[in-house]
Amino acid sequence: YQLVLDRRIGEYRLPDGWSIIAAGNREKDKAVTHRMPSALANRMVHLEFDVSPDDWILWAQQAGIRREVIAFLRFRPKLLHDFDPLSSGKAFASPRSWAFLSGILDANPDPDVEYELFRGTVGDGAAAEFMGFLRVWRELPSVEDILANPADALVPDDPAALYAVCEALSEKAADGTVNALVTYAGRLPSEFGVL
């Protein structure tokens, strides 16, 4: 209680203006929690947060998360966090596990074990959907081809492929590519032209 009540730890005192923030798991999530003593709990404000796909994507773009992971989660935002505390499965989709999956992709795993690695990271359902998306992603026209020939480059029909192309192109937005991007975006279905 010393930190919360006295704003100090031993001889160290927190500077004026500093706030104390504690984070933890909810008991209902069955994620190694311990009940907080009521006297301590009564000295805090308790808030629950939902995962925001938009906020996570903003973070992911700056944190070096793979483009295909970001594109997939734009396409299927409900899979960013898919936790069921009653499930017996060990792996489940969460912001942390998607970041970990991005690291697996960085390691360029053998295609024969790739799906198993994904299953063991984000769970069965999310891994299956991601693998389907990844197959489409890997068959897309290259960004270089689109920028070189925006009026004639392939425009995919599949929504997953369109999300993937838009994500890849967003990484190339710069003064020298604006005209090509606008030309290509004008050929996309209207709901994708603004991505």
Residue spans of the language-model regions?
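C-terminal regulatory/interaction module of P-loop NTP-utilizing enzymes
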Residues: 1-195
